[in-house]
Amino acid sequence: MVVNPCLSFLTSYQSTAVSQDALAADLSHFTIRKAQVQDLASLAEMLTDSFHSQTGIMGWAYPVLRLGIYEDLRNRLRSTVPHYVCLVALAVVSGVGGSREELAGTVEIALRSPSSWQPRRSQYPYVSNLAVSKSCRRRGVAKQLLLACEQTASDWGFPDIYLHVLENNHQARQLYLKTGYQLHQIEPSYGAWLLGHPKRLLLQKHLSTTSNQ
């Protein structure tokens, strides 16, 4: 189960994402590193909360979706595929008891093979599963995670990077446009043609020699 894509985990999980009280104390800065096994529970909760609703008719499926995301992510982290990275942003929260790191966001980057309908070309770096804790949104976390992905793609020797966004996700589209992504292709979809579902847009960014600019 890819969002975009331990039985004890089926029980109610208390997220370790940054709380509003902690942010009120002082969110001074955050760091980005590769995800580790101990991050799995927090990452699964953040991804499920970002892409699935806990209310309504599908609310009952939330724990199952969360477990599926947990298992898929665990398998990817264990993989020996050379061109795959899951990154996490850790907020450094300062309070009366001192400072500590808490999960603020995550993103994955891997090489992707072209779909059958796409022009024939070799694999390309593809960004997926970008998610930010609700408490840390509009603080530059997503932008810094994207920049880290761009640096990774550049380190791998690729001149371009790609990602998908739904045409009706205006906030995400605005972020990507501001960070230099451009429309590469509108993905064909029977759901969009027949059912009025939003189209998926494939965006591309050409990477400069200094991708962190």
Where are these regions (language model features)?
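C-terminal "cap" of GNAT-fold acetyltransferases
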Residues: 159-162, 166-173, 178-213
